[in-house]
């Protein structure tokens, strides 16, 4: 019976991921075919679809690398961070997951995210600021949250949408005017691929995997404080991966609002404290 429930849950999770992936790519397909049709009618629409297909193929192949490069992340070895590897191995074993690749971003802001096309190709990236800010229990909770995204099949639609947003907004570095048009399209791609509900689920599943909801709540408080002090500038590349992070890396104003996908901190803390048996 338990195996049947696990299988049903996995099928549902895969179906949900597929639906979010389709929703994420539709805006690009519509944009390319619409522009093509406006320029050259039916032939242009077909050409636009061909362009969209090429972009999707390239993005699918390199989406995780695009996301990691946006944060200047580099692979980290076990020699450099043996304790980080130990925690990830323990949590992966507890969650019956392959051990993900580990990366570090030089950002001083405390944050983290997971990318990949499936659990076997998953990677977790932590910022230098995260490792400097959290104690072991808090870091364990954050890593549990990221692994919950892996087990929940959230990675493929979220990572592909990050890659698509990076590709869509890249011309903005050359012509800021294009960003006025392409920025909302990239934001729509991201919003259709993720939901706040997935963050709540990752918080709960990650806290249970790590065994300490209070520690994850403490980590979120520190991360939010770090973001307030060291908010990143919402440039095109970073904006395209902001939805992957455990907390938004931006001040919630201006252009960054387009890419806001994270639930309110207060509600995340309330749910984690309820999970731990606390009452406010």
Positions of predicted regions on the chain:
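Polar-ligand-bearing catalytic/cofactor-coordination segments
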Residues: 1-26, 46, 56-174, 186-280
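Hydrophobic core of alpha-helical transmembrane segments in multi-pass integral membrane proteins
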Residues: 27-34, 52-53
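Short, hydrophobic transmembrane alpha-helix segments
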Residues: 33-44
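Hydrophobic core segments of alpha-helical transmembrane domains in multi-pass membrane proteins
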Residues: 44-55, 178-184
